[in-house]
Design a protein with these regions (language model features):
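Conserved beta-strand->loop/alpha-helix structural units within folded catalytic cores of enzymes
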Residues: 161, 166-167
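Short, flexible, mixed-charge acidic loops at enzyme active sites
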Residues: 129-139
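A short acidic, glycine-rich active-site loop
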Residues: 139-151
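Nucleotide-sugar donor-binding/catalytic module of glycosyltransferases
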Residues: 170
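Domain-scale signature associated with acetyltransferase and cell-envelope carbohydrate enzymes
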Residues: 1-125, 150-155, 165, 173, ...
Length: 205
């Protein structure tokens, strides 16, 4: 374990001192190393998929990633097993999850093929407690994680920077979710949505 930490630190130090023209090849080497080291932690991990430096994983044994998908730097991928649910987080083929994005799953989150997200996107099917009067008297961190309904994102959806996909939502294929939108209900196929809460502003078909 120590040798892996030392190698990771070495790559980090080299990125600070090497010329810029060498920086990107060094990044590619580091990304390949991280992917090789961590791919076995997942339930399934497709050929050609990559994990960038800084990705944080929490109980990835419940996570399936398809082929040729990229999880960019500093993303958080987590599942939250509970006494009532075994999480099922499925990320499809040809996905690009933007930097600093966060996917958290207590029950079921399905992301279809060809989905692209910007940075700082949140996709969640859960929350701390059930938002009841009883829970209001308990510190949020002390409340049990509770799934509020599955999230299902169809193929070829484009999600802009800082958008939030809340629990119990289905987004149809081919949709565009504008930056900063908060999706609280189902979105039909080929819709463009924006706002808080997100509303349909255009249909693509």
């Amino acid at each position: 374990m120590k040798i892996f930490l030392l190698i990771g630190q070495l790559f980090g130090y080299l990125s600070l001192i090497v010329p810029r023209k060498v920086e990107y090849p060094l990044y590619l080497i580091r990304r390949a190393y991280i992917t090789t080291r961590k791919r076995g932690l997942f339930k399934t991990f497709g050929n050609g998929s990559l994990l960038a430096p800084g990705v944080k994983l929490r109980t990835p044994a419940h996570v399936s990633i398809g082929k040729n998908s990229s999880i960019m730097s500093h993303c958080i991928i987590e599942t939250c097993p509970t006494d009532k649910c075994t999480p099922h987080l499925k990320i499809g083929d040809n996905i690009s999850l933007g930097e600093y994005s966060h996917i958290t799953c207590a029950d079921k989150v399905i992301i279809g093929n060809g989905v692209l997200t910007g940075r700082f996107v949140l996709i969640t099917d859960n929350g701390h407690g059930k938002s009841t009067e009883r829970d209001a008297d308990i510190a949020p961190l002390a409340r049990k994680i509770h799934s509020n309904g599955p999230v299902n994102i169809g193929d070829n959806v484009w999600i802009g920077d800082k958008a939030t996909i809340l629990p119990n939502v289905t987004i149809g294929k081919g949709c565009i979710i504008a930056a900063n939108a908060v999706v609280t209900k189902d979105i039909p196929e080929y819709s463009v949505v924006a706002g808080v809460p997100a509303k349909i502003i255009k249909s693509l078909k």
